[in-house]
Regions:
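Mid-domain Rossmann-like dinucleotide-binding core that forms the NAD(H)/NADP(H) cofactor-binding site
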Residues: 72-151
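Glycine-rich cofactor phosphate-binding loops and adjacent beta1-alpha1 units
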Residues: 127-130, 139-209
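C-terminal hydrophobic helical "lid"/dimerization subdomain
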Residues: 89, 221-269
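Rossmann-fold dehydrogenase core element
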Residues: 184-191, 200-240
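NAD(P)H dinucleotide-binding glycine-rich loop of Rossmann-like/cofactor-binding domains
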Residues: 29-106
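Glycine-rich beta-strand-centered segment in the early N-terminal region that forms part
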Residues: 1-34, 69-71
Length: 269
């Protein structure tokens, strides 16, 4: 949908300081009501409720163009906005700290890889699930342990690891096993269901083990500001899988659907 953009401001609208022209920015994809910015029911998303960035030029609200100073390329910076803000929003909602052990299914994906890096930044112990062919790429993100994508006996595969948080964008038929291995008082945070939204669940697992489930979609504006700080001081790094010229957008989308990549695919106008 072209939600992640990095570029340079070339023009501004009425009421916007002309000094912003020439400023390097990345986009905050969440469109908020300027009169009621805290109301989650009055939000849209860049590339959905507003035309996105699959273009040579794009427009956005001034508040959504976030200044950034970095030696990273535009293509590298374009990997951050959507995936990393989604991940940081999930970890923020789940109150992840250095006392947690976090399990990340789908760690080779854009959000999954961001979850690995951002949870490590918080000092948590991180265990990643990914297909064996992608283990080397995932290892570069810094998890403490990497397991197969969907071990038949997840508890045995984890050994003595005590999982306090599952940060998930996968869902699907494996979901119940993710919940089953959570420690008492554990937290499950979710912002996607790429393997399927319908799951079977025994509610007794939820209440007898005092679990907390948190959905995460609309992020607080401060999340994006925090991400920029992390990028500028080098605390997180881009996971750029491939680039395609804008005229090869169809090929880029086909590569994304094929899911043979690790990280994010970027289109360059």
């Amino acid at each position: 949908q072209g939600a992640d953009i990095c570029g340079e401001i070339v023009a501004v609208g009425d009421g916007v300081d002309a000094a912003r022209i020439g400023q390097r920015v990345i986009t905050d994809g969440w469109l908020r009501d300027p009169d009621d910015p805290g109301n989650m029911d009055k939000t849209g998303y860049y590339g959905s409720e507003r035309d996105g960035g699959f273009a040579e030029y794009a427009t956005t609200l001034a508040v959504n163009a976030v200044p950034i100073t970095s030696n990273l390329s535009d293509a590298e910076l374009a990997t951050f906005s959507c995936s990393y803000s989604t991940a940081e929003g999930m970890l923020t909602r789940a109150n992840v700290t250095d006392k947690d052990t976090v399990l990340v299914p789908g760690a080779s994906g854009g959000v999954g890889g961001a979850l690995v890096q951002l949870a490590k930044r918080r000092g948590a112990r991180v265990i990643a699930l990914a297909s064996e062919a992608k283990h080397a790429d995932v290892a570069a993100l810094g998890p403490d342990m990497i397991l197969q994508r969907a071990p038949e006996n997840l508890r045995a595969a984890l050994g003595g690891e005590k999982i306090t948080v599952v940060a998930d964008v996968v869902g699907g038929p494996y979901w119940a096993k993710l919940i089953d291995i959570l420690e008492r008082g554990g937290r499950y945070t979710c912002s996607g269901a790429i393997a399927g939204p319908m799951v079977e669940f025994d509610l007794r697992t939820f209440y007898l083990r005092d679990l907390t489930f948190t959905g995460s979609t609309v992020i607080d504006p401060q999340v994006m500001q925090n991400l920029v700080k992390y990028i500028e001081v080098g605390e997180i790094k881009p996971a750029l899988a491939a680039t395609f010229p804008l005229e090869k957008l169809r090929d880029a989308q086909a590569a994304f659907i094929a899911k043979r990549h690790t990280g994010n695919i970027v289109v360059i106008p």
